Amino acid sequence: MKIATWNCNGGFRNKIEPVSAIDADIYIIQECEDPSRVTKSTDIYKAFSANHIWVGENKNKGLGVFTRKSSKISMTELNQDFGSAKLKWFLPFRYEDRLDFVAAWAHRGDTGEFRYIGQFYWLLKNNLGSLDRQIFIGDLNSNKIWDYKRSEGDHSTCVRMLEEVGIHSVYHHFREQQQGQEADPTFYLQKNWHKPYHIDYVFAPLERVKKTKTLEVGKFESWQNYSDHVPLVWEFDET
């Protein structure tokens, strides 16, 4: 099983060829357009997006999940309430009736409170009693280095909440690295080599993490013409 997450920085319909080369079973794509409302399309995009789920408000920038046409995916339910608003953006789904995921693109939210990782914190807080087998994957817009900016719901708190129910970061476990000390950036602010950050993640139950076959972080020189992010690709043995 191979899963890829990538913030495409918009215009995903024009970036299908390099993404398709990853040959993943599931793609989690942030900042992508709603495939059902794309007016100018190509055959390769139509084929790639034939089996998808998408959430968002702006038809040009949302959160999409794409899989092979023969695969089965369906949305599942999580409590995404935050007062009178909704948490943004999280897409819980089930793959082939056997794997549960939560795709993520941590956003500013609507209230001005608990932005980015704070949105993820409240998702965990709302649902933690039922989150022990899910795979969380996506752009959290967060890193431990920014913990000092928050009095509640920081990055380290979220990592700890997940670890307490047996869910761990694949990158950090497989590469034997510490949070906040990542050697491989996933994001280059303003596409600047000198502003690298690790803000994209996969968290999974430890028994799945231990079955990791490969964990790859894309090279910026290969992706800088397409986005300020690089793909994070996880392959694991499903048996």
How would you describe each model-predicted region?
Residues 1-44, 49-63, 237-239:
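N-terminal, active-site-proximal structural segment of metallo-dependent hydrolase catalytic domains
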Residues 8, 32, 106, 140, ...:
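Active-site metal-binding loops of divalent metal-dependent hydrolases
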Residues 12-14, 35-38, 109-111, 143-147, ...:
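Short catalytic/ligand-binding loop motif for oxyanion handling, primarily in non-cytosolic enzymes
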Residues 26, 118-199:
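Metal-dependent phosphoesterases centered on the DNase I-like endonuclease/exonuclease/phosphatase
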Residues 33-107:
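Structured beta-strand-rich core segments of catalytic domains in phosphoester-bond hydrolases
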Residues 58-75, 95, 182, 188-212, ...:
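Conserved beta strand-loop-helix elements of the APE1-like EEP
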Residues 101-111, 152, 160-164:
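Active-site-proximal loop/helix segment associated with metal-binding centers of metalloenzymes
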Residues 225-239:
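Surface polyanion/phosphate-binding segment centered on an Asp-His-Pro turn
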